[in-house]
């Protein structure tokens, strides 16, 4: 359940919710890091749930030694009231036997909070694309029926491509198609739940490979900004996203020179 950091429970009615899927390369989580850090979003609450692997650490967005010791947990909510934006950062994998419970928790919170729309940032294995997905941009989107009428035209104007369905029996028959997001974690199931429960959701994902996924995170967050205009885009160049201090340890500490 959601627990507020303050005495009063914040109102999210009419807000846009952005959350990542724990997927290949952790691209969605890295993109959310950039968003929280750049907008300097304060934490307004966290989730107390047994669906995620427990974790605790220092404040990943600390700007000084004073707030560096602030405790961070596996799922925290940040907010920007002027932009009517809420961000849920998930820092731990979902326990395999609790995936369905986690999806129910998310759907229930989305409905009770009155979010205007939810945006799920995700990724999928690039090596498992089919022929039609090899051409053009690696970015894809999906819209739930309740959001499709409002946003489809806008996405087409941006030149975005909808996630293609692929054949259930490739090379044999194309009559039966399915949505396939390899490496996408909870993406497909949560999107399907939102379609069934009439929850407005957009999924924005990128095909990538495991490794240094920082460029993928920048590509994904720039794509999101083109749609939502969270930060003003300069006439020349791209938006200057602020990398959080925690990224210094993204690949661990350096090689000790004494080894040589």
UniProtKB/Swiss-Prot annotation:
UniProt keyword Chloroplast, yes or no: no
Keyword ATP-binding: no
Transmembrane segments: none
Pfam families in the cross-refs: PAC2
Main location: nucleus
Known partners and oligomeric status: Forms a heterodimer with psmg1.
Gene transcribed to yield this protein: psmg2
Compartments, record wording: Nucleus
Record's function text: Chaperone protein which promotes assembly of the 20S proteasome as part of a heterodimer with psmg1.
Cleaved signal peptide residues: none
Biological-process GO terms, alphabetical: chaperone-mediated protein complex assembly; proteasome assembly
Protein name per UniProt: Proteasome assembly chaperone 2
Recorded family membership: Belongs to the PSMG2 family.
Database matches in SUPFAM superfamilies: Cgl1923-like
Assigned GO CC terms: cytosol; nucleus
Keywords: Chaperone, Nucleus
Organism of provenance: Danio rerio (Zebrafish)
Record PTM: Degraded by the proteasome upon completion of 20S proteasome maturation.
């Amino acid at each position: 359940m959601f627990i507020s950091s303050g005495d009063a429970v914040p109102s999210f009615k009419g807000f846009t919710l952005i959350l990542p899927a724990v997927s290949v390369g952790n691209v969605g989580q890295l993109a959310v890091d950039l968003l929280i850090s750049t907008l300097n979003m304060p934490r307004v609450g966290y989730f107390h749930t047994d669906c995620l692997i427990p974790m605790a650490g220092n404040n990943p967005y600390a700007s000084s030694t004073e707030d560096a010791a602030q405790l961070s947990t596996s799922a925290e909510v940040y907010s920007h009231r002027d932009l009517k934006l809420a961000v849920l950062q998930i820092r731990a994998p979902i326990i395999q036997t609790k995936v369905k419970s986690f999806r129910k928790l998310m759907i229930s919170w989305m409905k009770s909070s009155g979010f205007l729309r939810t945006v799920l940032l995700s990724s999928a294995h690039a090596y498992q694309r089919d022929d039609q997905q090899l051409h053009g941009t690696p970015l894809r989107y999906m819209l739930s029926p309740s959001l499709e009428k409002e946003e489809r035209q806008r996405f087409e104007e941006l030149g975005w491509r909808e996630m293609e369905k692929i054949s259930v029996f490739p090379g044999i028959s194309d009559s039966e198609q399915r949505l396939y997001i390899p490496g996408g974690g909870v993406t497909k199931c949560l999107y399907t739940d939102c379609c069934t429960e009439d929850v407005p959701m957009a999924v924005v994902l990128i095909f990538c490979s495991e490794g240094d996924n920082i460029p993928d995170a920048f590509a994904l967050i720039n794509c999101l900004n083109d749609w939502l205009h969270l930060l003003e885009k300069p006439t020349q160049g791209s938006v200057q996203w602020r990398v959080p201090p925690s990224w210094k340890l993204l690949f661990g500490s350096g090689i000790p020179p004494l080894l040589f």
